[in-house]
Amino acid sequence: MGHQDILRRASFAHVCGDSIIAAIAGLALYASFPPVGWWWLSVPALALFVSRIDEARAPRALTVTFVFGMSFWVPLIDWIPLAVGTTPPWFVLALVQTFFFVGWVIFARWTQLWRWARGPLAQAFLFALTWAGVDAARSRWPWSGFPWGSVALPQVDSPLGHLAPYGGTTLITAVVVFLAVLVRRAFAARDAAVLREHWFSRPALAVIVAAAYVAPLAISLPNQAENGMLRVGVVQGDIALPGAEAYSREGEVTENNVRASLELASSPQVTGRPIDIALWGEGSVDRDPLAFPAIGQAVDRAATALDAPILIGYTNLNERDRVKNWLAVWEPGTGMDESTRYSKHVPVPFGEFIPFRDVIASFATEVAQASKDMEAGEEPPLMTVQARDGRSIPLAVGICFEAAYPLVIGDGVARGGQAIVVPSNNYHFRSSGESAQQGQLLRMRAMEYSRSAVQASTTGHSYVIRPYGSILASTGTEEAATLAADIPLRTSQTLTASAGERIPGAVMVATLIIAILATATVIGQGIRASARARRASGH
């Protein structure tokens, strides 16, 4: 066996070993999210991943990153096949999200060509900034993006979650990656940049990590009411599976929610202390209650029994033959005012609308070919309800996956929303981790904007969340259930709410600038290397 063969085999073995470690890191990062929920694994998992790529040559770094990304994304979104009925979209979405990781590692590695960027703090800063920028970009593009899987989200249960009001997921993401790089540098077996410093360099890095991790606990997350309390009832009527068949039977889903509402109305938690409003899930009314009088009468029966308005969800077709996904407030005895409705702003690509329909329908499933696109709404994500004492209470609203989009929920808060309400329909996902992951996203929104938040699901999980992100009350999945709780209403605006898209926008611009400069450095080095080669050859 020749020397070159030995080197090739050693290199292959090295790549395989690194890939196994990267897979472990990806699975560990997945485990920091629901349904596992070991949030404390986020930083170690990323540190382990960084240890495999920060000194690797480009081919190995790309391979390792691909393995890490797929090991993370595939189990995280294993609920996709439950919703679409087939596995290819699951792997395609995981692949697309992994490519964002691969893009990040290219530019992150290139920054290490700058001599000043090789120290622990400089590397941590550049890796953190660019990861946060790429994360912000993939959460917004293509189409509406996919905000799932941000490494900030498990921090709702960690001290780093206390940073949410001061920079949202963008800031927390950057801090998580920053700490992960420092952990990697502090515990690396060989690190020339650290070894050149004093003997205490590694302990100092460890102290910095520990201090930075616990320091946010000094930041208080307020919970007190600024405009009194609102007593809410959450109605989870449940849907018989398969859900499509349940929706095909007129009134079945509506009656499930009516039945649960009547049980709530007669329960001690409501008879002793009446609610101000009941919250039903997305699609909780299976027909347009204005077009189907019997459906409207059923909803009114529930509202009358509760002696409170009900926030309902339903769909209909508009004049352009497009689906509209509505939230509306139904007042007992008087019905609903169409002028105060909200329709979903961010339909889910390939789920609620088909991009490039003419092309895709030619080879898509029969359902995709026959389905109608959902049209995005234009109404402000803010609805006003009347409390029992006569107060007008503005609520920031979103529908289902819109809990993942600060652009929607943040807009509602900036417009004066004093609490956040997100009706959801999770029957597609059954008892998978999707609903808990969505609840985690809503917990982050509550912390970012210092608002109480409620997820009212048709099938679970439903959550009542405090302004600092902890869960006040919750339900299980695939069951009929109700909740009643008092939530504090708040009016002050956090920095995250006031800044809006400016924080992630600035980080994305900074990331783009770094990527351009790093690319220019690589090109410049290539040009200089070619010139030296020509001189050496005498040409």
Label every PLM stretch briefly:
Residues 33-48, 72-77, 236-237, 272-287, ...:
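Short, conserved active-site loops that position catalytic residues or coordinate cofactors/metal ions
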Residues 230-231, 325, 381, 449, ...:
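Structural detector for hydrophobic anchor residues on beta-strands
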